[in-house]
Curated annotation (Swiss-Prot):
Keywords assigned by UniProt, alphabetized: Cytoplasm, DNA-binding, Transcription, Transcription regulation
Cysteine-cysteine disulfides: none
Subcellular location: Cytoplasm
Keyword Transcription regulation among UniProt keywords: yes
Region (Disordered) residue spans: 1-22
Protein name, per record: Probable transcriptional regulatory protein Pmob_0807
GO cellular component, one term: cytosol
Pfam families: TACO1_YebC_N, Transcrip_reg
Species the sequence originates in: Petrotoga mobilis (strain DSM 10674 / SJ95)
HAMAP family noted in UniProt: Transcrip_reg_TACO1 (MF_00693)
Family: Belongs to the TACO1 family.
């Protein structure tokens, strides 16, 4: 599993333990609104919104709150003026980071991001110096125990438009072009697989971190995750699973 996705899973578990429901709901509501504003209010034709709705339901967000957030994105209801920004940064060990934020105050958020990066061994980067190393992709995951024939799954996924399948992860990861995410997801669901999906940024090259730099980076990622305006952080780091689990337990 890539470093980013492994950390995302650990972060999800931590979030449930920390019970930061208010902050979590704020982030989910903003993602619903931005996703609807970007691609329309129909989850079936808008994969980003579909993922946002699934995440909101998984967090037990009331249906009326989900619908209200979507309508604010489509303009059916008035809402706060939100801006989506992608900051480029470097972290410990030379790791490249993309920091996705949604904010109602760009100046405040820029100062907060800069402060957190500086405190934990990172720094903002010039525009383009980090983003070149990432590609926008669709990511579908399937529980490994559901798959009896990996070759059959791979053939089905490729015929539906997938680019790659990583069988060395659990859950299995299937990569698609963003525009093919929906059709691949539909083909897999029709075949009876349990799928989770999202749009993500995947690195073209990765950096293997020492234990020391890995610990610094996870502290930085944790601090960024704790910011109200930060939606997600993408990185090109590699950390051994055992090391990440051990370090994350102490953060």
């Amino acid at each position: 599993m890539s470093g980013h996705n492994k950390w995302a899973n650990i972060k999800h578990r931590k979030g449930a333990q920390d019970a930061k429901r208010s902050q979590m709901f704020t982030k989910l509501i903003r993602e619903l609104t931005i996703a609807a504003r970007e691609g329309g209010g129909d989850p079936e034709s808008n994969p980003r919104l579909r993922t946002a709705v699934e995440n909101a339901k998984a967090a037990n967000m009331p249906k009326d709150k989900i619908e209200s957030a979507i309508k604010k994105g489509t303009g059916e209801l008035e809402g706060e003026e939100l801006t989506e920004i992608m900051y480029e940064a470097y972290g410990p060990g030379g790791v490249a980071l993309l920091i996705s934020v949604v904010t109602d105050n760009k100046n405040r958020t820029a100062q907060e991001v800069r402060h957190v990066l500086s405190k934990w061994g990172g720094a903002l980067a010039e525009s383009g110096s980090v983003s070149w190393n990432f590609e926008r992709k669709g990511l579908i995951t399937i529980p490994k125990e559901e798959v009896e024939d990996i070759d059959e799954l791979m053939l089905l996924a490729v015929e539906a438009g997938a680019e790659d399948l990583d069988e060395n992860t659990d859950p299995l990861e299937i990569i698609t072009a963003p525009e093919n995410l929906t059709q691949v997801r539909n083909a897999l669901k029709e075949a009876g697989y349990t799928v989770s999906e999202k749009l993500t940024f995947l690195p073209k090259t990765t950096v293997k971190l020492s234990d020391e730099d890995a610990e610094k980076l996870l502290k930085l990622l944790n601090a960024l995750d704790d910011m109200d305006d930060v939606q997600e952080v993408f990185g090109n780091y590699e950390i051994d699973d055992e090391v990440m689990e051990r370090l994350a337990a102490n953060i």
